[in-house]
Structure formats: C-alpha cells, structure tokens
Amino acid sequence: FNKFGKARLYYEMSLEEQDQLFESTKKNVLPTITQMNLKYAISAKNRARTVAGVSILSTMTNRQFHQKILKSIVNTRNAPVVIGTTKFYGGWDNMLRNLIQGVEDPILMGWDYPKCDRAMPNLLRITASLVLARKHTNCCTWSERIYRLYNECAQVLSETVLATGGIYVKPGGTSSGDATTAYANSVFNIIQATSANVARLLSVITRDIVYDDIKSLQYELYQQVYRRVNFDPAFVEKFYSYLCKNFSLMIFADDGVVCYNNTLAKQGLVADISGFREILYYQNNVYMADSKCWVEPDLEKGPHEF
C-alpha cells in the first residue's frame, strides 16, 4: 500500500503528465508548503537538528530542471566536487592522491561551516541556483528560465513553512530537504574558497610579491574585479589553473579539504585558514571557532575529518 510513501501520487502520474507539470512551472509559480521536522538521530552532541521536507511537486520539478548538470557532477571523476565518487575500491586513496598531486610544499586544511544551511546568504543561494542552471541556454527561453528561478526561490529560499502547527515564512537559507541541497552547498563552498583567494591575493602589497607571473596575475585580477564590467573568460581559466596548482580543493556539500602551497600562503598569495575566517565573517556573518577547523602539515596523517 505505502510503497512510495507520500510520493505515491507523483509516481502514479504518467510521464506525459509529469512533463506537463514541469512545463507549467516555466510559466507559473507553484504554491507549496515545506514541513519542518525534528531529525531523529543518535548523536553524541546534545542538540536537536531540523530537516525541511520540501513538497514533492517542488522536488521533482527542480530535479527535472537540473538533472543534466546534477548527473554530470555525479558521473565526473577527479573533479573538485566529489559527490557521486565512491570511497570504496581505492576511491578514497584516489581522491586524496588527486588532491595532493602537483601542489608544491603541500599542507592540508579543512573546515566546517557553523550553521551552514541557516547562515547562507540569500544572494549566494540564488547564485548557486544560477550556476547550476547555466547550461540551459539552448533549450529554454529567458522567461521560462526566470520562472524556474522564481519557483526555486519560492520553494527553497523563502517558502511557507509548517512547523509545529504554525505557518511561517522562512527568511532564507537552504532547505535541507531540497533536491539540490548538496549541489548548491558545493557551489557555495567553491564560491567561498574562490572569494577567500581573491581577497587574499588583492590584499598583498604588489612590491612584496617576488614572483613576476603572480605579480601580473594580481594586476589582471585587480583589473577584472574593480575596472571591468564584463569579465574575461580567458583570465578566469588562468586564475582557475593557478588555484588548481596552489590551492587544490576536494568538496562534498559543505565539507571541504584543501591542499595548499604553504610557501605561497606565508606570503599571502593563496588563502590559509585565517583568510577563510575573514571571508566567513563578512560574507556569511558567522564566526568560525578553532574547534571547527584543522590544519595538518604531515601528509602521511591525511585529513582529520571529511
């Protein structure tokens, strides 16, 4: 009887009906309600967590819209986002080797975002939606895409929440039960890491930089950030390869491990843990305590937690 749980209604729809529903979300905003539930788990920590159960209509239409990019994230190996990669059959070893390779004078560090789902700024959650939807250039018109964004914001960002008998409007942040939560958190994580590096590199006094290539990179970055209206894709590739070489990332939702070049970090050319703290403080409004982050100079020991 209950073989699909509460989702039974959706799964009994034919594929044509599912497509019709999806098409209607490109012209209308579906009104849905999200239910807040207390998470039931055995934990050493003395605290309650909540899980937001997003409506099946919202979940399925969002997944249908983002399906291509989500599948490509899941099926791509040796990329910064490791969602979908197995840790068995040598997968974990492979991920760590891939993280460390090519980085000179490597040091590992990791962090944990305090109150990640609750503290995420609305603008960054919207940005994550836009980044995930960036491939929809040929298949949808602009108005269809903007309605998809409206739907996603109405159902994930500031939707109506049913909590213990009262109905509230959520002020923002991520819904933990949304279909794209893990992916959006990963995008957010990459944005924070990149922001930390951009801020750190721009804050260095140019005459103190001993490497000429990094000096010119800093100048170009300054031009891109402060002088230009439209960014230069070639520079984005250049900066990306600089980060890959000196600030290698491994990301799973809001967890992350970084292998960075310690020589450059001491000169302030790539971000270290203090750079992360600063970015979190002014971009996420949370303070990251010592207990939330770790740095490990000895690669033999590996990451502390991931």
Swiss-Prot record:
RdRp Palm N-ter: region residues: 76-114
Residues covered by region (RdRp Fingers C-ter): 115-173
GO biological process: DNA-templated transcription; viral RNA genome replication; viral translational frameshifting
UniProtKB keywords: Nucleotide-binding, Nucleotidyltransferase, RNA-binding, RNA-directed RNA polymerase, Transferase, Viral RNA replication
Region (RdRp Thumb): 306
Reaction(s) this enzyme catalyzes, per UniProt: RNA(n) + a ribonucleoside 5'-triphosphate = RNA(n+1) + diphosphate
Stored Pfam families: RdRP_1
EC number: 2.7.7.48
Region entry RdRp Palm C-ter, spans: 174-306
Residues of the Nsp12 RNA-dependent RNA polymerase domain: 1-306
Top-level enzyme category: transferase
Stated family: Belongs to the coronaviruses polyprotein 1ab family.
Protein's name according to its UniProt entry: Replicase polyprotein 1ab
Taxonomic source organism: Turkey coronavirus (strain Minnesota) (TCoV)
Gene field: rep
